[in-house]
Curated annotation (Swiss-Prot):
GO terms for molecular function: NADH dehydrogenase (ubiquinone) activity; quinone binding. Belongs to the complex I subunit 6 family. Gene3D superfamilies: NADH-ubiquinone/plastoquinone oxidoreductase chain 6, subunit NuoJ. It is a multi-pass membrane protein. It is an enzyme of class 7 (translocase). Pfam families: Oxidored_q3 (PF00499). The chain crosses the membrane at residues 10-30, 32-52, 61-81, 92-112, 152-172. This is NAD(P)H-quinone oxidoreductase subunit 6, chloroplastic. One of its GO terms (cellular component) is chloroplast thylakoid membrane. It comes from Barbarea verna (Land cress). Keywords: Chloroplast, Membrane, NAD, NADP, Plastid, Plastoquinone, Quinone, Thylakoid, Translocase, Transmembrane, Transmembrane helix, Transport. Its EC number is 7.1.1.-. It catalyses: a plastoquinone + NADH + (n+1) H(+)(in) = a plastoquinol + NAD(+) + n H(+)(out); a plastoquinone + NADPH + (n+1) H(+)(in) = a plastoquinol + NADP(+) + n H(+)(out). It comes from the Eukaryota.
Amino acid sequence: MDLPGPIHDFLLVFLGSGLLVGGLGVVLLPNPIFSAFSLGFVLVCISLLYILSNSHFVAAAQLLIYVGAINVLIIFAVMFMNDSEYSTDLNLWTVGNGITSLVCTTILFSLMSTILDTSWYGVIWTTRLNQILEQDLISNSQQIGIHLSTDFFLPFELISIILLVALIGAISMARQ
């Protein structure tokens, strides 16, 4: 969107704080239904951030796929699960949870150090080179492909990682 600077900054801070509140709601709310609705709120905020950054196609895909399909599927799965499983399990922290949190924390810090230590000059140079190629393309799908592999590479990969985590979670829930 082409908004004036202060309005753009306000919306960015507002959506970022909405992401933080929604993420805390996903983690801290004891009721799984409320956590699923909070996840839906987080996904809508992410979609609005994509609209704010002029990537309307990614925002529409985010709304249709994640909010419209995956979040509804999560809500149905949580609603159909038996509540007695949650109330009888009093062991809140196990060895597996500790190992999982250690692995996830290690991956988080390694990703943070990789992102901070990487020189992003080559990525910007490739993006500017593909803007020249963009003028010769007629098809919108080719332009979307170039944008997904250059300008929106990081959001596209983050969405694919979220989808992979959802698939792994669905497989682990199906095995139980």
